[in-house]
């Protein structure tokens, strides 16, 4: 019987290649052109994207990226590369290739890298703990497009998500506990997830339920009272309603209500990036403090923590 050689396609969203308006514009154009991300009719969306959004947002977003840029590059890329290297070391003889939904390295190049190593079974681990049509399904769409030109297809295992995986929950809980030990237990632990349009959920995307599942399991693992934990949604874009409660509005409300000490974690982000390091660690901290809060700590993403890499290995081993 012929043996099967498995390989891992490690996927994340992507990032601009430089903190410049031109690089950000290229990245945003690709990202915001995906129908899974924005499903507005093209005859409405194209003029708005090209004539208004890209020219206005690119310079502003480039400044934000510059404020968080690391010596090695974009934080998301730096941590993703570290994850790729650590997972490869943990798996030994199983090839691992990093691909981004948008930007470089592309999913196309990552798949080809695995095929060049004679892989005939690709395990797709998209680092989105909670499934959404705008993230995980977008990866599947792109993989279908890429492989449409192949005569010989590799077999693929697509891991839908891992919102309730015990190893994932344990890694989150360890991170929270370390923060509590370092800064003291806060009045409130706030779990901020990336938002999606409410309409997507109304049409069947189970993302909000998967976020609730993670929150429930994490609260149980921590052994703290449910009323000391709150779940919110961040990073809304555009005018239509998104999942609520909104993180920024909640920060203001908590400060005004007299909450003095909060700690914030973003369980849906596997690597720190603009949305965590700038939006949550900086912008929302300012909102909370200006509204009357006193202590605010952001709990970093799992990044390349050993427990995070061990979780990835456990998932991959299950499907080898």
Swiss-Prot record:
GO cellular component, one term: cytoplasm
GO biological process entries: heme biosynthetic process
Pathway where it operates: Porphyrin-containing compound metabolism; protoheme biosynthesis; protoheme from protoporphyrin-IX: step 1/1
Keyword match Lyase: yes
Main location: cytoplasm
Domain of life from the UniProt record: Bacteria
Alphabetized GO MF terms: ferrochelatase activity; metal ion binding
Keyword field contains Iron: yes
Pfam families given in the database record: Ferrochelatase (PF00762)
Binding site for Fe cation: 194, 275
Listed SUPFAM superfamilies: Chelatase
Reactions it catalyzes: heme b + 2 H(+) = protoporphyrin IX + Fe(2+)
E.C. number(s) listed in UniProt: 4.98.1.1
Keywords, sorted A to Z: Cytoplasm, Heme biosynthesis, Iron, Lyase, Metal-binding, Porphyrin biosynthesis
Classification via InterPro entries: Ferrochelatase (IPR001015), Ferrochelatase_AS (IPR019772), Ferrochelatase_C (IPR033644), Ferrochelatase_N (IPR033659)
Subcellular location: Cytoplasm
Family the UniProt entry places it in: Belongs to the ferrochelatase family.
NCBIfam families: hemH
Role summary: Catalyzes the ferrous insertion into protoporphyrin IX.
Protein name: Ferrochelatase
Organism the protein comes from: Cronobacter sakazakii (strain ATCC BAA-894)
């Amino acid at each position: 019987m012929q043996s099967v050689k498995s390989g891992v396609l490690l996927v994340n969203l992507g990032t601009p290649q430089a903190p410049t308006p031109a690089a950000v514009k290229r990245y945003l154009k690709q990202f915001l052109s995906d129908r899974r991300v924005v499903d507005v009719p093209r005859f409405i969306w194209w003029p708005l994207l090209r004539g208004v959004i890209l020219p206005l947002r690119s310079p502003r977003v480039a400044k934000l990226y510059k404020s968080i840029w690391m010596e090695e590059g974009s934080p998301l890329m730096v941590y993703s590369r570290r994850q790729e290297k650590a997972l490869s070391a943990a798996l030994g003889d199983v090839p691992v290739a990093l691909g981004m939904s948008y930007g470089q390295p592309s999913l196309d190049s990552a798949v080809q890298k695995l095929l060049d190593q004679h892989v005939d079974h690709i395990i797709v681990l998209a680092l989105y703990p909670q499934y959404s049509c705008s993230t995980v399904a977008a990866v599947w769409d792109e993989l279908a497009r890429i492989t449409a030109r192949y005569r010989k297809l590799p077999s693929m295992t697509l891991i839908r998500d891992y919102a309730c995986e015990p190893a994932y929950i344990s890694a989150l809980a360890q991170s929270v506990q370390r923060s509590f030990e370092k800064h003291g237990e806060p009045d409130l632990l706030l779990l901020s997830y990336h938002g999606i349009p409410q309409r997507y959920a109304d049409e069947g995307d189970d993302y909000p339920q998967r976020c609730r599942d993670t929150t429930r399991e994490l609260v149980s693992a921590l052994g703290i009272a449910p009323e000391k934990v709150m779940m919110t949604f961040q990073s809304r874009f555009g005018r239509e309603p998104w999942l609520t409660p909104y993180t920024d509005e909640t920060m203001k409300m908590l400060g005004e209500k007299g909450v003095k000490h909060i700690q914030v974690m973003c369980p849906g982000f596997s690597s720190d990036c603009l949305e965590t390091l700038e939006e949550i660690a900086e912008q929302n901290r300012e909102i909370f403090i200006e509204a009357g809060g006193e202590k605010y700590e952001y709990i970093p993403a799992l990044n390349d923590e050993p427990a995070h890499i061990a979780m990835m290995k456990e998932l991959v081993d299950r499907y080898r």
